Amino acid sequence: MALPFVVVLPLLIVVAAGVYYIYNEVIRFMSKSLVRNKVVVITDAVSGVGTECAHLFHKGGARLILGGTNWDKLESLYDSLTSDADPRETFAPKLVILDFSDMDSMEDVVSEVLECYGCVDLLICNSSMKLKAPIQSVSLEMDRNIMDVNYFGPSALAKGVLPTMISRRSGHILLVNSIQGRLAVPFRSSYAASKHAAQAFFDCLRAEVEEYGIVVSTISHTFIDASHHPLAAGEPAPKTNALAAFIASQLTHGVRPSVLANEILQTVNRKRKEVVLAHPIPRVALCLRSFCPPFLFAVLAAGVKDSVLTEQM
């Protein structure tokens, strides 16, 4: 006797979920094994995403070179990585002070990075500087600082390690960018400009180095949701328009550092050239920017007048 459909359907769902889980576990295991012995540079290892990447790649057996602007934080990360690690399976990380806001130091930084192991297999550029302000209030000096950290720094480091990658005809350069490298929103003029510049640079680089077997990847994500900030005790919740509040929540519903770090690992192992980590509304906005820009411009202009969107974008 055939089983009723109402019985078969739940069984199929359970079996499919089990297969999907096993598949993900196998892929995750293979991903870690693929980075073993690889020389991996993380430009901002002390950030939330950088720390997650450091733990992930360290467990996978990569030879890490960890960059950051704060030596104490780098040493703390070093201790957390090595305290419970098996020295037979992992390598002690190398630490390098790396500050993209100091462009005069970049030549020395490149030399120090290459001296660690003589080459770089994977460069992860995840350093970033953010700013939210009306255009007229942003000084030219601040514009330059943001361009140094978000564009000139990553591009200079990529140029610095490129000759060794070309000579070995292998390597991977990954830019952790932002959705605002594709879509500019109000009050993020300097930040969006720097991210657009970085996106364009690495897109050009990808085409130029493909013949040498070098992979260039970009990951465009919404904001990184490192923590939740509830309202202070006794603080009244602001009155907002329901539709505007929904749109704002979608635009600012960020990516957790652990999720982004796993995506970085998957991107490296699958050699993806471009990844967009965004929820439906930013994706729709990207489509509107391409196919119906006047409508998007009108929505953004109207959003500036709405207190909710102004605060959340």
Map each language-model feature to its residues.
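Rossmann-fold cofactor-recognition segment
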Residues: 84-104
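Substrate-binding pocket helix/loop in short-chain dehydrogenase/reductase
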Residues: 134-135, 139-144
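SDR active-site lid
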Residues: 207-280
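Conserved glycine-rich cofactor-binding loop
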Residues: 39, 46-47
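Conserved glycine-rich Rossmann-like NAD(P)H-binding loop of the short-chain dehydrogenase/reductase
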Residues: 62-77
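Active-site helix of classical SDR
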Residues: 158, 194
